[in-house]
Amino acid sequence: MFIFDCEVFAYDWLFVFKDVETGEYTIIHNDNEAVKQFMARSPILGGFNNKHYDNHILKAVLCDADPKQVKEINDFIILKGHNGWENEFLSQYRVYFESFDLMDDCLVGLSLKAIEAHLGIPIEESEVDFDIDRPLTEEELSSTIFYCKYDVDATELLLRLRKIYLQNKMNLGRECGLSASKALYMTNAKLTAAYLKAEQRPHGDEREYQYPKQLLRQYIPDEVFHFFDRLQDLSIPDEEVFSESLDIMVGECPCTIAYGGIHGAIPCYSEETSKDRTIRNKDVASYYPHLMTLMGYCSRNIPSPEVYAETIERRVAAKKAHDGETADALKLVLNTTYGAMLNQYNDLYDPLMGRSVCISGQLFLLELAEHLILECPTLKVIQLNTDGIMVSLDYTDEPKYQEITEEWQVRTGFELEEDFIRKIVQKDVNNYVEVPMKGDPKIKGGLLVRGVLTNTKFELSKFGLRDWPQLKGGAFKINNNANIVAKAIVDRLAYGTPVEQTINDCNEIFEFQMIAKAGGKYSHSFHLVNGEQVPVQKVNRVYAAPFSVEHGCPYGTLYKTHAMKGSTSKISGLPEHCIVDNNNQLTIEAVDKTWYIRLARKYVNDFLGRKGLKRNTRRVNSLKKKCLTLL
């Protein structure tokens, strides 16, 4: 297995291949025959975004394209935004090699440079201009090789971090008779379809949804049925009906019903368990998989519903037998099937069944919530989401609460898993801190969740990394942006610790890093230093810089320039004064902790619903002008 990357210029192209086992590099520059000889070894190639880019450049070289043609294909993909297989030169040839893309099943928009930055390693970008209209000098070529090797090393690091994910794919491939390389090449959705032996069939009944007979309709407001009945009105275009939503109140909880599920939470709400009152959360175990099997919503493209039901049973058996490999591989199937049923390019595509899972799922939970509100006078719905409900109630209502939830389980066949909550603090449905009676707080939301998704517990120091928090989940994601602020918010909301204490007690500089990314639509970035525009990379690690009225600060913020429009704008989310440190040379003494304290306080107030005093911007600006006139 080799990790590879390529670079393309007007008169030069370069490939770097790294043997994962030996660590040996193979570097090839402008030599088509050398590439052919290397590929004759039938290597399995791994890269990042190689399906979209590097594979097509490699194919061009294997088809004897000269540097000019390779550059044209590069521009066809990068500048013009086309797919490589649409290129006229490439479409003439049939070239096959085994590869996989570590960008598959990643969070959309995540770049390799951003991953490097969030991992805390130096962010290295090539200083050689890709628009050079002449052959590279020896110095430029040497520099390009260095940076290309650096990206290959970073991709190899990502390979090791995603070891569990890749192993699950290979195990699942083995289950359905696929080679390891074939399984790695496929996305989770494609691999799931292959495992379930799905064969795409035409379906023209996406809007013929039927309400499940197990539903107690009397507890659900009529307006909800009116909303979903619009499916039957074919005069309403698909794009209109499926983009609609309905806002309702479930007790005191504002909820939104839509074709992506139900979501609701009392905004800026907090509550603690007391001697008279309890907070409970009930999630439906494997809700969407069981909707498919119990309600008959499996894709009609698989041989029979029993195939999917057997997968659930096999996973349960594997977990009981402590067969982690099989259990994790089958979990991939269960977590991926629903989304694949709504993907028109997947063999599981069956939109009626996909819509039915989502609609019935929210109706059953809405029915439960409304029933509880009706018969438990002290009960309050705190949260209602796609697979669970959180409530608080007096202990006097608990017998009725348990009676209703038990009846719901028996009637529907679903299983509710209950958690006892000590404290809940939520900003909205997507941002909350939930403190259980036992264990660490459960957190959700972009303001709070930090770390790298590994789905296991690695010793990250073995990879030369600091001990970042490790997450579990689906698509690969990483976010180590201003971690200290997230920690300060959680400590304050969960335990009452002042944000000043959490932040001032921390002297680990990486906890304060912020990753400034310009984005693909921008040609370059610059840093304002002493009023001058200093060019910087498109992805940068920055820290808040100290500022005083007496001494000021030489450092401004970072800006980005739009590639097409030429317009300049600030990179959002950064301090007015910040320092760039892509090579990790700064110490904590250079960081302005007060900026992070102010930010943490603001977010805590957002959670608690405390609105800060609004500044009269017009009056402030007017006073500024008057002062300047006097000077």
Predicted regions located by residue number:
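Conserved DEDDh/DEDDy metal-dependent 3′-5′ exonuclease domain
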Residues: 21-114, 147
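Two-metal-ion RNase H-like nuclease active-site motif
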Residues: 1-8, 99-101, 280-282
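C-terminal, non-catalytic extensions of nucleic-acid polymerases
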Residues: 398-631
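Entry/capping segment at the start of metal-dependent catalytic domains
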Residues: 1-16, 23
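Short active-site loop/helix that positions an aromatic residue
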Residues: 15, 52-64, 285-299
